């Protein structure tokens, strides 16, 4: 059976990763978390004390980074070389700085090449900010997932608590609103809905409902 490329885009906290994982599992597809790749670069840059808004410097860093995504029992595992950074890339420090790194053309161009290679055989669900517009513009199914700032902050708050991290709901709302502004206004690959993407607001929907809707859309795209 033909396997397609599915592109899920949307702002921070829209539930893309959780939904993409379950959708991929349901369809027996491979899930590719592009956000984790940008987070890995951000972690490496922070650890080396680099200027997060210096594109050429980050471009040089990219040449030395071996970022790998592998499946694991609890979900996707992320490595830089042989070091696992699955949890390290989810800290508040990385979260608050990843948008600075992601706007650098040198970083995006390198990661886009890697992401396209991962997707070339189809049978993938890829989520991010510019998958349908830049990375996989020919994807057979494109969906733009979103939710209210309040709901997205609440989801992130619950995730942080579950990970045993300190979390401030009001602070998260402010951070997400600022992240939206940065992502939508950046010069390189801004966050926006692809012209042929389906808009899906998940504020009032649970995960199972969203996955069911996306499964229907995927089955329709296969016909």
From Swiss-Prot:
GO BP terms, alphabetized: nucleobase-containing small molecule interconversion; pyrimidine nucleotide metabolic process
Cross-referenced CDD domains: CMPK
Record flagged with keyword Transport: no
An example Gene Ontology molecular-function term: ATP binding
Coiled coil: none
Reaction catalyzed: CMP + ATP = CDP + ADP; dCMP + ATP = dCDP + ADP
Protein name, entry field: Cytidylate kinase
Organism expressing this protein natively: Exiguobacterium sibiricum (strain DSM 17290 / CCUG 55495 / CIP 109462 / JCM 13490 / 255-15)
Gene from which this protein is expressed: cmk
């Amino acid at each position: 059976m033909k396997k397609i490329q599915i592109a899920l885009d949307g702002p921070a906290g829209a539930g893309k990763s959780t939904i993409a994982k379950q959708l991929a599992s349901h369809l027996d597809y491979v899930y590719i978390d592009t956000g984790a790749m940008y987070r890995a670069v951000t972690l490496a840059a922070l650890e080396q004390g680099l200027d997060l808004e210096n594109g050429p410097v980050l471009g040089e860093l990219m040449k030395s980074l071996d970022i790998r995504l592998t499946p694991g029992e609890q979900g996707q595992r992320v490595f830089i070389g042989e070091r696992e950074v699955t949890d390290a890339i989810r800290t508040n420090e990385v979260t608050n700085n990843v948008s600075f790194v992601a706007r650098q053309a040198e970083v995006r161009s390198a990661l886009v090449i890697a992401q396209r290679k991962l997707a070339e055989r189809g049978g993938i669900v890829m989520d991010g900010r510019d998958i349908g517009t830049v990375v996989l513009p020919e994807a057979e199914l494109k969906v733009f997932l979103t939710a209210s700032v309040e709901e997205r902050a609440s989801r992130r708050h619950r995730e942080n608590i579950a990970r045993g991290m300190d979390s401030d709901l009001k602070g998260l709302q402010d951070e997400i609103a600022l992240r939206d502004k940065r992502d939508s206004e950046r010069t390189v690959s801004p966050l926006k809905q692809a012209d042929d993407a389906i808009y899906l607001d998940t504020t009032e929907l649970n995960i199972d409902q969203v996955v069911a809707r996306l499964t229907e859309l995927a089955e329709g795209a296969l016909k």
